[in-house]
Amino acid sequence: MRLIPLHNATDVGLWSARHIVKRINAFKPTAERPFVLGLPTGSTPLQTYKRLIEIYQAGEVSFRHVVTFNMDEYVGLAESHPESYHSFMYNNFFNHIDIHKENINLLNGNAPDVDAECRRYEEKISSYGKINLFMGGVGNDGHIAFNEPASSLASRTRIKTLTEDTRIANSRFFNGDISLVPKYALTVGVGTLLDAEEVMILVTGHAKSLALQAAVEGSVNHMWTISALQLHPKSVVVCDQPATMELKVKTVNYFRELEAENMKDL
């Protein structure tokens, strides 16, 4: 596992955006051989999307031959709802780049058969071989995507019941009213994430510090699904200084020295 300990959330957004651009450009995608990118929603990746849009507008990257798969979607929320993840992705990213609509893959939380929808999603991912880079965030309780504590580390795309803690955290997007937050979501599984060629997780803020500690210094534990990154041969965690508050000083210093060359020019 790589840990990139940066100063603040703005730096996390810039570093992660540059990393995605480097991976896409090095891959040299074509229509027949697209770059497959996994994407999250939430407040943490907003800086990354902002930077990616800026880099695209500067002519330094194209998304014409990029295929995307999003991590999750609420069940029962209309696609047009302002807090649906469909709306989030189009408003904050897709509407501002040159990606082809047919290359955008999002789970349908209103599918008449959600189990069939989850199987379809897994099959669509498999049809591309693998996801080249899956970017994600993490919850305060260490969940990645909507793989809540005690999720199987071998899980695939499925419907999940959201914990009260997650619904309380997400109520800030629903005028602070937890009753408006859906109780269920469709989500890729931990196993789905681990199948990706590379996984990059963004961790910002003191509230995520226990989750980061579990990921980096803890043991692999299904109560902290982020800890499954330890099983991945090519995982990278990009964090800010407040998120490192529960890590040992020597741990942070070790990774800071190790990644010094990769943290220049921010």
UniProtKB/Swiss-Prot annotation:
Catalytic activity reported: alpha-D-glucosamine 6-phosphate + H2O = beta-D-fructose 6-phosphate + NH4(+)
PROSITE patterns named among the record's database cross-references: GLC_GALNAC_ISOMERASE
Record comment: activity regulation: Allosterically activated by N-acetylglucosamine 6-phosphate (GlcNAc6P).
Pfam name, any one: Glucosamine_iso
Enzyme class, first EC level, given as a word: hydrolase
Residues under site feature: Part of the allosteric site: 151, 158, 160-161, 254
A Gene Ontology cellular-component term: cytoplasm
Keywords of this entry: Allosteric enzyme, Carbohydrate metabolism, Hydrolase
HAMAP family: GlcN6P_deamin
Protein name, per record: Glucosamine-6-phosphate deaminase
Gene label: nagB
